[in-house]
């Protein structure tokens, strides 16, 4: 075993996290978004500066713990990428309450609210069941993209749209989700439970299944024009495209088609670098849609 230094080159440094990535993607598509996020200590202040420099509208919640830093390592010979995400700060009860209040206040200025990512330590698993009625009270619609124990707990409250990747969907139903048929069973379960109006289960290189009360739509991913470099941020790019098009008046299927294309475009950039809008819109024309009745 060789032991020594591994030299690295810093290619890209940016503010990140699910909601921030979505806000960046919305801006890339020409939409308007406000990122609501926590910021703690020195790294939290740097996060605020990065967002300001990038011109992303944001509302920080100051917390006692230090904001975490995540890393994507891209190995240039194998072209493999490794997403390293350390544990984040723990929020206390007061910070959790202030977080709810801040989300509700920001929601009033937007027709759609995206709740993205796993919950930080300190927040109860049922946090999103508290978020959902507050969002409804503002007249906004909630799009939920979460994972871990918060995912099944969130089913107790209806939202407008839910996105699960195949791993999260498998966690929900207790079995592997690998095909469009598997995804259809998951989406049917979510719709039948009244947990959502629109259910989206993503299937990696296959694409995604978008389901509503009117039927199921298989959205087959377009062929990539180049070698995939990283899947970090692909899900956030998808949600950004979907919410942008929903806010512009598109129906969920057309919005999801651009979402599948944005996820594909995200894979063509290394690390967490954002997708190219023109590439995403070009790939959207190659997304094949197969409509199935319920």
Please place each PLM-identified region on the residue numbering.
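Glycine-rich phosphate/adenosyl-contacting loop at the front of the ribokinase-like
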Residues: 1-36, 45-49, 220, 225, ...
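Conserved phosphate/ATP/ADP-binding segment of small-molecule kinases
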Residues: 126-216
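A glycine-rich helix N-cap at a beta->alpha junction
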Residues: 52-65
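Conserved phosphate-binding/catalytic loop of the ribokinase/pfkB sugar-kinase fold
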Residues: 73-109
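Short beta-strands and strand-loop turn motifs
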Residues: 83-85, 110-118, 145, 163-168
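Conserved phosphate-binding/catalytic region of the ribokinase-like
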Residues: 152, 180-294
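Gly/Ala-rich phosphate-binding loop of Rossmann-like dinucleotide-binding domains
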Residues: 27, 136, 247
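Short beta-strand scaffold segments in enzyme catalytic cores
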Residues: 24, 69-73, 207-211
């Amino acid at each position: 075993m060789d032991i020594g230094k591994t030299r690295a080159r810093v290619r890209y440094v940016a503010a990140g996290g699910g909601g921030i990535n979505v806000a960046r993607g919305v801006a890339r598509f020409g939409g308007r978004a406000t990122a609501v996020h926590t910021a703690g200590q020195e790294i939290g202040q740097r996060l605020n500066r990065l967002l300001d420099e990038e011109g992303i509208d944001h509302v920080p919640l100051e917390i006692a713990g230090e904001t975490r830093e995540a890393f994507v390592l891209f190995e240039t010979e194998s072209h493999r990428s490794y997403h390293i995400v350390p544990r984040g700060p723990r929020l206390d009860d007061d910070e959790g309450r202030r977080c709810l209040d801040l989300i509700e206040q920001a929601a009033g200025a937007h027709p759609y609210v995206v709740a993205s990512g796993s919950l930080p330590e300190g927040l109860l698993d049922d946090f999103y069941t508290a978020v959902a009625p507050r969002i409804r009270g503002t007249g906004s619609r909630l799009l939920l993209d979460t994972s871990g124990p918060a995912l099944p707990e969130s089913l107790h409250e209806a939202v407008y749209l839910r996105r699960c990747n195949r791993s999260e969907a498998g966690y929900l139903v207790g079995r592997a989700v690998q095909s469009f048929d598997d995804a259809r069973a998951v989406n049917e379960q979510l719709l039948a439970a009244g947990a959502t109006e629109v259910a989206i289960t993503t299937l990696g290189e296959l694409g995604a299944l978008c389901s509503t009360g009117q039927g199921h739509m298989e959205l087959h991913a377009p062929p990539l024009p180049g070698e995939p470099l990283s899947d970090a941020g692909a899900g956030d790019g998808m949600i950004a495209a979907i919410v942008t098009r929903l806010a512009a008046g598109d129906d969920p299927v057309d919005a999801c088609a651009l979402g599948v294309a944005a996820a594909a475009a995200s894979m063509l950039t290394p690390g967490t670098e954002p997708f190219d809008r023109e590439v995403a819109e070009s790939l959207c024309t190659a997304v094949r849609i197969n409509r199935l009745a319920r």
